[in-house]
Amino acid sequence: MSITSPPIEVSVLTDSIKNLLEKNFLRVVVKGELSNVSLQTSGHLYFAIKDSKAVLNGAFFHFRSKYFDRKPKDGDYVILHGKLTVYAPRGQYQIVAYALTFSGEGNLLQQFEERKQRLAAEGYFDPKRKKPLPSGARVIGVITSPTGAVIQDILRVLSRRCHQFQVILYPVTVQGATAAQEISQAIQFFNQNSMRVHALIIARGGGSIEDLWAFNEEELVKSIVASSIPIISAVGHETDFTLCDFASDVRAPTPSAAAEIVCKSSDQYRQELQNLRRYVSSHARQFIAAKKNLLTHWQRHLASVDFYHTAQQTLDYTRAALERGIETKLEYYKQRFAQYRRWLKSDVLIRIEKHLADLNQSLMLSIKNKIYTKKTSLNQLYTSCLKNELLNLQHRTQHSRNILSQLSRRLHIAIASSQQTHQECLVRLQNELSFTIQHLLTKAKERCQAIQEQASSLNPKNVLKRGFAQLFDFNKHFVIISAESLKQSDLVRVCLQDGEAVVSVKEVWLNNDKKG
């Protein structure tokens, strides 16, 4: 614009700068220290973000509804995502943020993404290497804290969904510097010992990214990949993701869901996969169409949204200025009130007090005379009313006595008749109750005797008395129920009625065929 150009209004120039700024800085990421933080009752956040050389004012609309769990304060180091705009009433440029990350969390998220990309490039998350879950797993290893609610949720689901199962718990700490190492050692323990575990569940409840960081350690990822036993990761809530989830063979949204997954058969998985495929295909088309319509709608109304934000910011600034004005006025009137109080303590106050005392004495004398006159009149009226009321009360009392006498005679007749009827009913009910109690006692005794006989027949010690024996491995870790688990020269502990014996296996037959 040259010197000879016609002058333009400030608002026109400001709008031109605003359009130019918003077009070239539509998406910016700024980091720095917060100052002058103010969270309004409307839920909008106003602040300044600065470094050692510059300061930038900013606004975050509807902040309270998005970040209700933590309120920023002066001195916080943050990373802001937003766009640059101009607040026209003050002629200053500012950032309007739509996302805020505290610096510590930002560093962890960046470290998470870098580690995830590197391990993925090395093949640790390759779907081809993932192992399928066995159908009908019955022996399940669980790696989690022994005191939390997670293990109780898993046991409750397994008890409801699985008919036969055995859980082997390896207790670990699930948070802190040693958690990743303990979980890795647990995975190695199950793989190196012949526990015959069909699947492993690594479980933990929800938490922040710092709480779940142990499950992002590279040591744990490599232990999961090296495991020959299929592993289900059930860490955090459904919205939480860790590197443990990507490395494991199956990811469950919650520990309870992991227990349900391990109980499912391959047919159930296949059916659920087909249903899910149909559901995703159908809803994806609907979702894309809806989002296209929504995008078109918001593109048309984007200008009105910016106008609303500007108006809201003006309203918040006006409210803040009004509050400051009210505080200033209050302070002014407090000072004026103090001046009036000092003035009233002068001679004027003394004259006013004397005049008030004279008025008070005259008023009290007049009140006493009025009270005496009204009291005399009231006593006369009260005496007359009392005599009339007493006469009426005597008439009502006599009438009530007559009615009471009639009711008393009728009540005696009704009570005598009712007692006879109730006595007969009571005798009948006592007879029926005695018969019912005797019948129930007889049935309960018969049922108790049957249960005792059944329990006696199921008692393993009674079975041993009939010539049977129980076989255990040498260390009595598990019961031997199949000849397939035996091989030649194995040492077996035999439990008899009156003692135990250790025997060595010479030969094993399966269905009349010799095993070895």
Swiss-Prot record:
Functional description taken from the UniProt entry: Bidirectionally degrades single-stranded DNA into large acid-insoluble oligonucleotides, which are then degraded further into small acid-soluble oligonucleotides.
Major site of localization recorded for this protein: cytoplasm
Top-level enzyme category: hydrolase
NCBIfam families given in the database record: xseA
Gene: xseA
Record GO biological process: DNA catabolic process
Domain of life of the source: Bacteria
Family indicated by similarity: Belongs to the XseA family.
Localisation per UniProt entry: Cytoplasm
EC number, as in UniProt: 3.1.11.6
UniProt name for this protein: Exodeoxyribonuclease 7 large subunit
Species: Chlamydia trachomatis serovar L2 (strain ATCC VR-902B / DSM 19102 / 434/Bu)
Record field: catalytic activity: Exonucleolytic cleavage in either 5'- to 3'- or 3'- to 5'-direction to yield nucleoside 5'-phosphates
CDD domains named among the record's database cross-references: ExoVII_LU_OBF (cd04489)
